[in-house]
């Protein structure tokens, strides 16, 4: 199985306004099939006021610029007709500040007030987030404070209230009825206060629905494993970082340690990736990787157990350094051609934000023999021929050599030997010659 993460606004335009939309996604299906994609993960498509969409103001309507329900259903049908599943990003930890529920709560409606989390006399109003020390409690003009783990524009939902739980289950049922195949659950480890409570929440929430459930649990292995048994698919942040760090530092030790933590002996499918919307792009890691190292990183990604996931544009070597608060740079328009005015091309409305496309576009890279795009297409073809690798076991054959990474992938009588060369010179392992920054599979 091969996944592909898409920021709809930047991917492909279907109505000539320069903004990606559902009709545009239909027009991109032939490319995604050629790339070997089995499912697409669409970042939030619901009504919201932000560019990223994680502050939903209505779970039953879509961003107007993306299209309406008819467009959405037609897009789903087109993907299914071509054998591609659709996974939606569903941020149910909170709503947007302008959601009807929160606006009614602000006006004093006791029913909707209980949909959110409010400070009591015992609340520590100086409580901070663990990852960046930002405040969690936010004041209103009347002196009340509400909880917003992800900022004042994203008030937390109160899942101690069973009505909130049922409201969000209705959203899930509605989307499944429209043909959605699964969900990526944002901030999945933050639904409840403790690990035990959080696991219990998700076990109950998912108990009567089927699909591809992909969880964002950015945490240590124990926490990931506990949730993995429920979700079935877990984003593997550990190995994602260590692939890039190993290639950047030219030392495989850190990757071997990560594989042992995050890929060995799991009863769920780790979903491996090289970048996403919450970090710098692969080609910009630590200031920038050479094209050779980008290719090697992708070779490693596609020769590990688990599900490989491509962040749109990584297959082209798109660049972008993640810096708050302006994180749009990692969500740049996807370059279909060298000419920004051609059909399907998206662009930012502010000309200064549009990056030059030269040498990065699909059009250019399909013609370039040694391009990153053709490199990754070789590996997606390899995975198509070896579906068993998703659940393969990994056996290390060479753990001491920092520039040579050798392992065997095994599953029910089938096996492959993988050799990665992280040096700038040819290396030999058991008679097999491996070119600089290259991979051989035997």
Curated annotation (Swiss-Prot):
<dbReference type="GO" id="GO:0009313">
    <property type="term" value="P:oligosaccharide catabolic process"/>
</dbReference>
<feature type="active site" description="Nucleophile">
    <location>
        <position position="186"/>
    </location>
</feature>
<keyword id="KW-0808">Transferase</keyword>
<protein>
    <recommendedName>
        <fullName>4-alpha-glucanotransferase</fullName>
        <ecNumber>2.4.1.25</ecNumber>
    </recommendedName>
</protein>
<feature type="binding site">
    <location>
        <position position="17"/>
    </location>
    <ligand>
        <name>Ca(2+)</name>
    </ligand>
</feature>
<feature type="site" description="Transition state stabilizer">
    <location>
        <position position="278"/>
    </location>
</feature>
<dbReference type="GO" id="GO:0005737">
    <property type="term" value="C:cytoplasm"/>
</dbReference>
<comment type="subunit">
    <text>Monomer.</text>
</comment>
<dbReference type="InterPro" id="IPR015261">
    <property type="entry name" value="4-alpha-glucanotransf_C"/>
</dbReference>
<feature type="binding site">
    <location>
        <position position="19"/>
    </location>
    <ligand>
        <name>Ca(2+)</name>
    </ligand>
</feature>
<feature type="binding site">
    <location>
        <position position="13"/>
    </location>
    <ligand>
        <name>Ca(2+)</name>
    </ligand>
</feature>
<dbReference type="InterPro" id="IPR006047">
    <property type="entry name" value="Glyco_hydro_13_cat_dom"/>
</dbReference>
<feature type="binding site">
    <location>
        <position position="21"/>
    </location>
    <ligand>
        <name>Ca(2+)</name>
    </ligand>
</feature>
<keyword id="KW-0963">Cytoplasm</keyword>
<keyword id="KW-0479">Metal-binding</keyword>
<dbReference type="Pfam" id="PF09178">
    <property type="entry name" value="MGTA_C"/>
</dbReference>
<comment type="function">
    <text>Hydrolyzes the 1,4-alpha-glycoside bonds in oligomeric and polymeric 1,4-alpha-glucans and transfers oligosaccharides (maltotriose being the shortest one) to acceptor maltodextrins.</text>
</comment>
<dbReference type="InterPro" id="IPR006046">
    <property type="entry name" value="Alpha_amylase"/>
</dbReference>
<dbReference type="InterPro" id="IPR045857">
    <property type="entry name" value="O16G_dom_2"/>
</dbReference>
<keyword id="KW-0106">Calcium</keyword>
<dbReference type="GO" id="GO:0004134">
    <property type="term" value="F:4-alpha-glucanotransferase activity"/>
</dbReference>
<feature type="active site" description="Proton donor">
    <location>
        <position position="216"/>
    </location>
</feature>
<dbReference type="InterPro" id="IPR017853">
    <property type="entry name" value="Glycoside_hydrolase_SF"/>
</dbReference>
<dbReference type="GO" id="GO:0046872">
    <property type="term" value="F:metal ion binding"/>
</dbReference>
<keyword id="KW-0328">Glycosyltransferase</keyword>
<dbReference type="GO" id="GO:0004556">
    <property type="term" value="F:alpha-amylase activity"/>
</dbReference>
<dbReference type="Pfam" id="PF00128">
    <property type="entry name" value="Alpha-amylase"/>
</dbReference>
<comment type="similarity">
    <text>Belongs to the glycosyl hydrolase 13 family.</text>
</comment>
<feature type="binding site">
    <location>
        <position position="15"/>
    </location>
    <ligand>
        <name>Ca(2+)</name>
    </ligand>
</feature>
<keyword id="KW-0119">Carbohydrate metabolism</keyword>
<dbReference type="InterPro" id="IPR013780">
    <property type="entry name" value="Glyco_hydro_b"/>
</dbReference>
């Amino acid at each position: 199985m091969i996944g592909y993460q898409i920021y709809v606004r930047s991917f492909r335009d279907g109505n000539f306004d320069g903004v990606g939309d559902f009709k545009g996604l239909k027009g991109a299906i032939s490319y995604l099939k050629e790339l070997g994609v089995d499912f697409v993960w669409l970042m939030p498509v619901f009504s919201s006021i932000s560019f990223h969409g994680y502050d939903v103001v209505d779970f039953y309507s879509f961003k107007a610029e993306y299209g309406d329900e008819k467009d959405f259903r037609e897009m789903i049908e087109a993907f299914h007709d071509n054998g591609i599943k659709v996974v939606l990003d569903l941020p149910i930890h909170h709503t947007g500040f302008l959601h009807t529920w929160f606006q009614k709560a602000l006006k004093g409606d006791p029913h909707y007030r209980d949909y959110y989390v409010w400070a009591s006399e015992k609340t520590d109003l100086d409580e901070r987030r663990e990852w960046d020390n930002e405040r969690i409690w936010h004041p209103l003009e009347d002196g009340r404070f509400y909880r917003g783990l992800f900022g004042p524009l994203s008030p937390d939902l109160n899942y101690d209230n069973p009505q909130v739980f049922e409201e969000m289950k209705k959203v899930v049922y509605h989307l499944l009825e429209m043909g959605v195949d699964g969900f990526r659950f944002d901030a999945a480890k933050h639904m409840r206060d403790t690990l035990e409570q959080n696991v219990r929440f998700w076990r109950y929430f998912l108990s009567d629905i089927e699909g591809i459930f992909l969880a964002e649990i950015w945490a240590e292995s124990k926490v990931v494993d506990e949730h993995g048994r429920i979700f079935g698919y877990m984003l593997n942040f550990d190995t994602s970082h260590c692939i890039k760090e190993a290639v950047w530092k030219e030392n495989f030790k850190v990757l071997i340690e990560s594989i042992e933590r995050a890929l060995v002996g799991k009863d769920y499918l780790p979903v491996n990736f090289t970048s996403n919307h919450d970090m710098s792009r692969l080609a910009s890691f630590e200031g920038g990787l050479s094209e050779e190292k980008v290719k090697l990183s992708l070779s490693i990604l596609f020769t590990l157990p688990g599900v490989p996931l491509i962040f749109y544009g990584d297959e082209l070597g798109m660049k972008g350094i993640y810096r708050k608060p302006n994180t749009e740079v990692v969500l740049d328009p996807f370059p279909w051609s060298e000419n920004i005015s051609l059909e399907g091309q998206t662009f930012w409305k502010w000309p200064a934000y549009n990056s030059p496309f030269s040498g990065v576009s699909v059009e250019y890279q399909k013609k370039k023999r040694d391009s990153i795009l053709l490199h990754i297409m070789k590996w997606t073809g390899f995975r198509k021929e070896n579906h068993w690798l998703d659940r393969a076991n990994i056996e290390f054959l060479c753990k001491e050599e920092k520039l040579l990474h050798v392992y065997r992938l095994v599953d029910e009588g089938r096996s492959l030997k993988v050799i990665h060369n992280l040096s700038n010179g040819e290396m030999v392992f058991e008679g097999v010659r491996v070119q600089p920054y290259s991979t051989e599979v035997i």
